[in-house]
Amino acid sequence: MKKSSIIDVPRKHDQEDLFGIERYQEALSEFIRNADTPLTIALQGEWGSGKTSLMNALRFSLCDSDKAPFYGIWLNTWQYSLLSTPEQTLIRIIEGLTNKIIEIIKEKHQNKAEAFAKTAMRFFKKASVEIAKIGADKLISGGKDVIGALSSSDEKEILLNDFRDELQKSINELIKYEEEKATGKNGILFFIDDLDRIDPPVAVQILELLKNIFDLENCIFILAIDYDVVIKGLKPKFGELTDKNEREFRSFFDKIIQLPFSCQWQVIRLKRS
C-alpha cells in the first residue's frame, strides 16, 4: 500500500536526497576540513528548512565515516530545556557539553579526564548559584548578562578562566595523542540543534555562553539557528529593530558567528511515485 503523507523528520545520511542537500554538504565539509579554529558556523533558515538534515549529513561525513577527521558531539538544546527554567536550561547545556567532552577524553586519558572533571564540578557548583541569582524574569527580559554574572569578581573570573584553561589543555592533549597515533582525528565538531525552538532571549544567552566558554582551539561549532531568532532574542536589550539600531543586532550576530550558511534551498525536488 502506498503512503502519501508528509512527515516532519530530519533526513538521515543514507536516505534519498530529495532536497538537493548533498552538494551543499560536500562544499561545507571541504571548508570545515581545512578551516582554522576556533570557528562557529550558523545554519540559517526557517524551522523545517533542512538545517538538521544538513547537520546529519555533515556529522556522517566528518565524524562517523571511516577515517573521519573529527570527533562529533550532538546536543539538542530543546530537549535540555524541557521541564526546565531558563536558568536550569543554561546550566544543563553547559554540563551536557562538558560531560560529552569528558567521555571522549576518558577513552584516551583517564587521569586527565578525572582532573578536568573536578575543575568542571567546582565551576558548575558556582555557576548554578550565580545563574540562579539572576532569575528567569531578568534572563528573559535581557536585564542581566549571564557571562557578566559568572565573571563579576576576581574569584569568579579565576574560576571561569580555570575551567576554560583546563578544558583547552584537555582537548589539546587529546588531539596531540591522535596526531601521535596518526588516527586522522584533528578536532571536535559540536552540533547544536533546535535553538530556534527555545525562547529567543534564552537562545541568545546560550549563544553568549558558547562563545565565552567553548570558543577554543581544535573546536568547531555548527549551530542551527536563524538570524530572525537572534533579532527576537535581542529585542529586550536593544528594542525593536530599526534602521538606527540594526548595526547593534548585526554586530552581536557577527561577534558570535564567523560563517553564516543559508539553508534556503533554491530548488526543492519532490519525488512522485
PLM regions with names:
Residues 1-83, 87-91, 170, 174, ...:
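Walker A/P-loop-proximal flanking segment of P-loop NTPase domains
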Residues 27, 53-61, 88-97, 166, ...:
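Alpha-helical scaffold elements adjacent to nucleotide-binding pockets in ATP/GTP-utilizing enzyme cores
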Residues 39, 104-108, 178, 182, ...:
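Short, flexible/disordered secondary-structure transition segments
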Residues 50, 81-82, 197-199, 229-233, ...:
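Flexible loop/turn segments at secondary-structure boundaries
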Residues 55, 60-180, 239, 246:
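P-loop NTPase nucleotide-binding core
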Residues 68-72, 186, 216-220, 225, ...:
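Short glycine-/polar-rich loops that comprise or flank the Walker A/P-loop
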Residues 155-232, 237:
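Conserved Walker B catalytic segment
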Residues 243-273:
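Conserved P-loop NTPase catalytic core
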